Structure formats: structure tokens, C-alpha cells
Amino acid sequence: MRTKHVVVLPYDEKWKQDFEDIKNELVEVLGDFAIAIEHVGSTSVEGLAAKPIIDIDVVVKASDVKRAIEALESIGYIHEGNLGIEGREAFAYEGKEHLQTHHLYVCPENSAELKRHLAFRDYLRSHHDAKEKYGNSKLEAAKLYPEDIDKYIEYKSPVIEEIYAAMKMKFN
């Protein structure tokens, strides 16, 4: 069991600005080789309860992944590899106390993981019932398992699988 305090909050309009603040810092270092900087994950879906952590996918050409890693390392991000998920490179960070807590990934533009993130986000944005069901499962999971991230994830997984089935996507 990984012990990690789980906090899920009602949607906060501030998360949009938190994303923009982080994005602005990323744009400065990545310049024009970042094809897009996408706000993904639950904080990107208006009205959805979420852990207050901004998920960000930096989209680059496959040939620019190494360049993006080096640029991000130059401003304090720590490359962690793909953490077992093909199609993305994950980053931790130090010295970013001025920014909202966030998870940062670099994804090649044709990555299946990027497509999955965007499709899930867009589906929840356009399907109120799915958004409500998912949000409720997250709130309930956090209430039941406030100190166990693995149980939290396990509890909400059937709802995620149901959403992927409705989207006709395979859930890993």
C-alpha cells in the first residue's frame, strides 16, 4: 500500500488560471517547438471534482522529445522517464513553489497516451452525466480511502472503465 493523503475538492475556477500561469512559464522555455500545451485531467473539466493538481501534456514532434526534456531540466524539472506508460515522459520539479502543484508530461504528437488524455477530457466536458458520475466516484473514494491512493484509484476505476466503454476506447 502506498500511503498518500488523498484530497478531492469541488471544481475551482482558479484552476484555469493556475494552468495558464504554468503554461506561460513553459512557453518561455519551450518556445515554438511545443506544438501545444494541453490542460488535461480532472482540473481541466469545468464542474468536475478533482485532486487540486494540474495535469499538463506538452505536445512536441517525436524528434523534439529530447530537446523538450533538456529545456525543462534547465528550469528545474526533473525527468523521471515514462514511469511505465509508453507515449509520455514524466517530470517532477523543485523550486516551483510559486506555481500550483502539477504533473507535467511531454508527449509526442501522435502518442496514444496523449490521445487518451484528450479524448477522456473532451468526453467529460461534453457529457454531463458521465462527469457527474465520475466526480461522485472520486469524492466517495477520497472519503473512503483518505490515506490510500491505491485504494482510491481502485475504487474509481470501474467508472473510468465505463466511460471508456461509452467512448469505445480500451482501458489499460
Residue ranges and their predicted role:
Residues 77-112:
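Conserved catalytic core of two-metal-ion nucleotidyltransferases
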